[in-house]
Amino acid sequence: MKADIHPTYEAIEATCSCGNVIKTRSTLCKPIHLDVCSECHPFYTGKQKVLDTGGRIDRFKQRFGVFGATK
């Protein structure tokens, strides 16, 4: 095997926009910023919102529902 061909794998800190700091390891070798993490993501916090897109779906069915009708 060749020596010194692999990038360095160092400990870094990933900081979320909510302020949570996650310590991990990466070949990036510099701190990174995260938009969401498990502390603030709605799926993990249980604060999910159901988006109502029924109006758009009904409008689509009105326009193109005729093409999908069975004969």
Curated annotation (Swiss-Prot):
Classification via Gene3D superfamilies: Ribosomal protein L31
SUPFAM superfamilies: L28p-like
Keywords: Metal-binding, Ribonucleoprotein, Ribosomal protein, RNA-binding, rRNA-binding, Zinc
Requisite cofactors: Zn(2+)
Cofactor note: Binds 1 zinc ion per subunit.
Alphabetized GO MF terms: metal ion binding; rRNA binding; structural constituent of ribosome
Example of a GO biological process term: translation
Binding positions for Zn(2+) per the UniProt entry: C16, C18, C37, C40
The keyword DNA damage is assigned to this record: no
GO CC list: ribonucleoprotein complex; ribosome
UniProt xrefs under InterPro entries: Ribosomal_bL28/bL31-like_sf, Ribosomal_bL31, Ribosomal_bL31_A, Ribosomal_bL31_sf
Quaternary structure (record): Part of the 50S ribosomal subunit.
Its job: Binds the 23S rRNA.
Membership in a protein family: Belongs to the bacterial ribosomal protein bL31 family. Type A subfamily.
Protein name: Large ribosomal subunit protein bL31
Species classification: Bacteria, Pseudomonadati, Pseudomonadota, Gammaproteobacteria, Pseudomonadales
Gene: rpmE
